[in-house]
């Protein structure tokens, strides 16, 4: 309750200071209105009907500057003794003195269109009953109202006395607008942080934070005032602060607003969500997070071990070394997987050795095949000559059966002939073992090999002779009689 009373007393004091400052501003504005001089002609008259809405862009810009200046004055009163003690913070009087030396508020000397609405007039005393933005509109008979309510002839005279170069001064607008824009942004942040507490002012103010910007205030002040960015001939009438965006333009006001709104939060402080937790709660959250990570890791390990169990053959996994059936667990699965991988590695090594041996054998056989292909003409000639001799001998045996001994002698002669040309054949084949043997015992070895080679033909000839002539060389007719009787 004491806090509410103190807040109300402070608010009352601020309102009194605001009233006093408003009176000072009223007197200063009245002094700024100059009377027309006769040495100017009508060439400098600017008709409001030449622009949409009946107001020139210069009028619109000056109205915005005037509103920002007024908000800056209110902000200086609401900031308290701390803002007044700072020598670098401009007050309302110093703001106006700087603005008066540069501009004379063109909206005091220009008339609005016939259909334009007059400015809403609200008393400062209605700040506790109406919305805050309406209380910050004109709290007195402003020079704009006076200019709209004066006779037409006087307004024409005032407009005629304005120099042409004075209407288009932009450097003065930059300084004034940047200064007032900073103050208006500080006003909105200070009201949000200091005055507008929900306990004491929720019933007195219908505060809307978005209504304190220049665009929203200008829309409240006069519905037909357009923003300077969309006005007619914007390149000629707008200041460089609107065209180029200086340091203190509304786009960069977030620095001052954030510094005022977050004055209680230091650069190294934690957020409010974590700042309200105790040490036990922080430790508990850390432990829960660690447990969740550990649980996820164990689940992944279990899943991969299960996949390994599907790769190992069941005969190796489900039976122990003694052949007894067992139920595999994680340790058994890992052990049998290692054994199975070692077994596969050994198989690969054995297969590599066998493959190497087979490739060497294939190479050796290919070399032998090429050497045999080179000796094929000699072997063909040998078989052709031996075939002719055999055919002649067989014809002689068939024609003259009594010439069997001669046939045997012919066969022996053919063997001798074969013995004469056979050694070069063995030398061309390249059998080194046989070649060395033939050099030491040429006749003996070759005779034995030829005897083995021709033994089949000799045995066949002897069987035929026994069949035809009998064992004791008797008459063939007797042999046939014995064969028939048998």
Curated annotation (Swiss-Prot):
<feature type="region of interest" description="Disordered">
    <location>
        <begin position="75"/>
        <end position="130"/>
    </location>
</feature>
<dbReference type="GO" id="GO:0046983">
    <property type="term" value="F:protein dimerization activity"/>
</dbReference>
<feature type="modified residue" description="Phosphoserine">
    <location>
        <position position="227"/>
    </location>
</feature>
<feature type="compositionally biased region" description="Polar residues">
    <location>
        <begin position="75"/>
        <end position="94"/>
    </location>
</feature>
<feature type="compositionally biased region" description="Polar residues">
    <location>
        <begin position="101"/>
        <end position="130"/>
    </location>
</feature>
<feature type="region of interest" description="Disordered">
    <location>
        <begin position="374"/>
        <end position="395"/>
    </location>
</feature>
<dbReference type="Pfam" id="PF00010">
    <property type="entry name" value="HLH"/>
</dbReference>
<dbReference type="GO" id="GO:0016559">
    <property type="term" value="P:peroxisome fission"/>
</dbReference>
<dbReference type="GO" id="GO:0031930">
    <property type="term" value="P:mitochondria-nucleus signaling pathway"/>
</dbReference>
<keyword id="KW-0597">Phosphoprotein</keyword>
<dbReference type="GO" id="GO:0061629">
    <property type="term" value="F:RNA polymerase II-specific DNA-binding transcription factor binding"/>
</dbReference>
<feature type="domain" description="bHLH">
    <location>
        <begin position="285"/>
        <end position="344"/>
    </location>
</feature>
<comment type="subunit">
    <text>Binds DNA as a heterodimer with RTG1.</text>
</comment>
<dbReference type="InterPro" id="IPR011598">
    <property type="entry name" value="bHLH_dom"/>
</dbReference>
<keyword id="KW-0238">DNA-binding</keyword>
<keyword id="KW-0804">Transcription</keyword>
<keyword id="KW-0539">Nucleus</keyword>
<dbReference type="GO" id="GO:0043565">
    <property type="term" value="F:sequence-specific DNA binding"/>
</dbReference>
<dbReference type="GO" id="GO:0005737">
    <property type="term" value="C:cytoplasm"/>
</dbReference>
<dbReference type="GO" id="GO:0000981">
    <property type="term" value="F:DNA-binding transcription factor activity, RNA polymerase II-specific"/>
</dbReference>
<feature type="modified residue" description="Phosphoserine">
    <location>
        <position position="241"/>
    </location>
</feature>
<dbReference type="GO" id="GO:0000978">
    <property type="term" value="F:RNA polymerase II cis-regulatory region sequence-specific DNA binding"/>
</dbReference>
<dbReference type="GO" id="GO:0000422">
    <property type="term" value="P:autophagy of mitochondrion"/>
</dbReference>
<feature type="modified residue" description="Phosphoserine">
    <location>
        <position position="81"/>
    </location>
</feature>
<feature type="short sequence motif" description="9aaTAD 2">
    <location>
        <begin position="189"/>
        <end position="197"/>
    </location>
</feature>
<feature type="modified residue" description="Phosphoserine">
    <location>
        <position position="142"/>
    </location>
</feature>
<dbReference type="GO" id="GO:0071400">
    <property type="term" value="P:cellular response to oleic acid"/>
</dbReference>
<feature type="short sequence motif" description="9aaTAD 1">
    <location>
        <begin position="27"/>
        <end position="35"/>
    </location>
</feature>
<feature type="compositionally biased region" description="Polar residues">
    <location>
        <begin position="246"/>
        <end position="263"/>
    </location>
</feature>
<keyword id="KW-0677">Repeat</keyword>
<keyword id="KW-0805">Transcription regulation</keyword>
<feature type="region of interest" description="Disordered">
    <location>
        <begin position="243"/>
        <end position="274"/>
    </location>
</feature>
<dbReference type="InterPro" id="IPR036638">
    <property type="entry name" value="HLH_DNA-bd_sf"/>
</dbReference>
<feature type="modified residue" description="Phosphoserine">
    <location>
        <position position="269"/>
    </location>
</feature>
<dbReference type="GO" id="GO:0006357">
    <property type="term" value="P:regulation of transcription by RNA polymerase II"/>
</dbReference>
<feature type="modified residue" description="Phosphoserine">
    <location>
        <position position="236"/>
    </location>
</feature>
<dbReference type="GO" id="GO:0005667">
    <property type="term" value="C:transcription regulator complex"/>
</dbReference>
<dbReference type="GO" id="GO:0045944">
    <property type="term" value="P:positive regulation of transcription by RNA polymerase II"/>
</dbReference>
<feature type="modified residue" description="Phosphoserine">
    <location>
        <position position="123"/>
    </location>
</feature>
<protein>
    <recommendedName>
        <fullName>Retrograde regulation protein 3</fullName>
    </recommendedName>
</protein>
<feature type="modified residue" description="Phosphothreonine">
    <location>
        <position position="150"/>
    </location>
</feature>
<dbReference type="GO" id="GO:0005634">
    <property type="term" value="C:nucleus"/>
</dbReference>
């Amino acid at each position: 309750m004491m806090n509410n009373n103190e807040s109300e007393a402070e608010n009352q004091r601020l309102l009194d200071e605001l009233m006093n400052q408003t009176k000072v501003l009223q007197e200063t504005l009245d002094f700024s209105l100059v009377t027309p001089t006769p040495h100017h002609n009508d060439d400098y008259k600017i008709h409001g009907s030449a622009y949409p809405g009946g107001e020139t862009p210069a009028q619109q810009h000056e109205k915005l500057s005037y509103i920002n200046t007024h908000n800056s004055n209110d902000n200086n009163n609401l900031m308290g003794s701390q803002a007044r003690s700072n020598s670098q913070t401009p007050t309302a009087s110093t703001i106006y003195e700087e603005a008066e030396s540069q501009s004379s508020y063109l909206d005091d000397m220009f008339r609005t269109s016939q259909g334009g609405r007059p400015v809403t007039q609200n008393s400062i005393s209605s700040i506790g009953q109406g919305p805050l933005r309406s209380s910050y509109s004109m709290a007195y008979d402003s020079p704009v109202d006076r200019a709209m309510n004066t006779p037409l002839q006087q307004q024409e005279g005032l407009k005629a006395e304005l120099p042409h170069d004075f209407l288009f001064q932009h450097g003065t607008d930059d300084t004034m607008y940047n200064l007032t824009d900073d103050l208006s942004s500080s006003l909105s942040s200070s009201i949000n942080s200091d005055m507008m507490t929900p306990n004491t002012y929720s019933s007195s103010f219908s505060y809307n934070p978005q209504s304190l910007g220049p665009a929203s205030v200008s829309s409240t002040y006069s519905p037909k005032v357009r923003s300077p960015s969309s006005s007619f001939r914007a390149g000629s009438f707008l200041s460089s602060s609107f065209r180029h965006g200086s340091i203190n333009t509304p786009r960069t006001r977030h620095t001052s607003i954030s510094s005022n709104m977050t004055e209680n939060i230091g650069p190294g402080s934690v957020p409010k969500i974590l700042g309200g937790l105790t040490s036990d709660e922080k430790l508990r959250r850390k432990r829960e997070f660690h447990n969740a990570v550990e649980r996820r890791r164990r689940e992944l390990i279990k899943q991969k071990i299960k996949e390994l169990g599907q790769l190992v053959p069941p005969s190796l996994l489900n039976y122990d070394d003694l052949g007894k059936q067992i139920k595999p667990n994680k340790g058994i699965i890992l052990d049998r997987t290692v054994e199975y991988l070692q077994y596969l590695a050994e198989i690969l090594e054995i297969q590599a050795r066998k493959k190497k041996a087979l490739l060497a054998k294939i190479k050796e056989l290919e070399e032998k095949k090429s050497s045999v292909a080179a000796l094929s003409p000699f072997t063909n000639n040998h078989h052709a000559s031996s075939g002719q001799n055999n055919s002649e001998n067989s014809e002689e045996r068939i024609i003259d059966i009594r010439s069997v001994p001669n046939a045997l002698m012919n066969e022996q002669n053919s063997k001798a002939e074969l013995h004469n040309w056979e050694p070069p054949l063995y030398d061309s084949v390249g059998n080194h073992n046989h070649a060395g043997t033939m050099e030491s015992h040429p006749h003996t070895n070759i005779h034995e090999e030829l005897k083995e080679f021709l033994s089949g033909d000799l045995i066949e000839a002897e069987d035929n002779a026994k069949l035809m002539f009998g064992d004791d060389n008797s008459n063939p007719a007797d042999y046939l009689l014995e064969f028939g009787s048998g």
